């Protein structure tokens, strides 16, 4: 399906370590603003997800050749609800994003070992429903290690969250401040775009 956009494109390239040094939604996910409607056909649309038991970040980018453009991003806030309701809302929100934006690929951060067993379990549940929602709608789902994501965006695998967020804004020409979870989700999407472009899709395919 061809989509179009009026926003400018930005070439996305891996950053060196030296160079790198330099709105919540609790219900249905809103449709993108009219300004995100396209005038230039793109090759691939990627939905990046940063699932969590309290809030889930999402970021959508369009890729054309060696360039990426921001389409939409934000957070699904489920704080204050029982776990069952949280998971249902995450599932519904991810499903709505896939239906609304029709991504060609969905990218998600690979789970890491957590010191707190209870937190690890809740994170796993949130990731599970997000993956299930995307896969059940036929999306191609890929996982990336946290270090690989940081390396792709900043050129430094141990970069901190502020550094990653700043590079995401720079690469996508964003003047707005991003919520931490939304920035992380966009970073995952950019990592997938770079991996796809390099022809080295070594992420773990889960769908």
Language model regions located:
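Phosphate- and other anionic-substrate recognition elements at nucleic-acid/protein interfaces
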Residues: 1-207
């Amino acid at each position: 399906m061809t989509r179009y956009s009026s926003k400018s494109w930005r070439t996305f390239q891996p950053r060196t370590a030296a160079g790198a040094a330099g709105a919540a939604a609790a219900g249905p996910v809103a449709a993108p603003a009219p300004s995100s409607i396209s005038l230039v056909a793109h090759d691939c649309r990627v939905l990046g997800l940063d699932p969590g038991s309290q809030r889930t970040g999402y970021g959508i980018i369009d890729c054309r050749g060696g360039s990426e453009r921001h389409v939409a991003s934000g957070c699904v806030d489920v704080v204050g609800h029982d776990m069952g309701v949280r998971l249902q809302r995450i599932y519904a929100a991810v499903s709505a994003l896939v239906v609304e934006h029709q991504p060609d690929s969905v990218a998600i951060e690979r789970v890491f070992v957590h010191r707190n067993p209870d937190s690890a379990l809740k994170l796993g549940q949130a990731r599970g429903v997000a993956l299930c929602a995307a896969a059940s709608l036929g999306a191609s789902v890929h996982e990336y290690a946290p270090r690989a994501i940081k390396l792709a965006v900043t050129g430094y695998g141990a970069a901190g969250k502020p550094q990653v967020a700043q590079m995401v804004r720079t690469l996508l020409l964003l003047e707005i401040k991003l919520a931490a979870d939304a920035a992380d989700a966009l970073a995952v999407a950019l990592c997938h775009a770079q991996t796809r472009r390099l022809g080295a899709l070594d992420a773990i395919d889960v769908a």
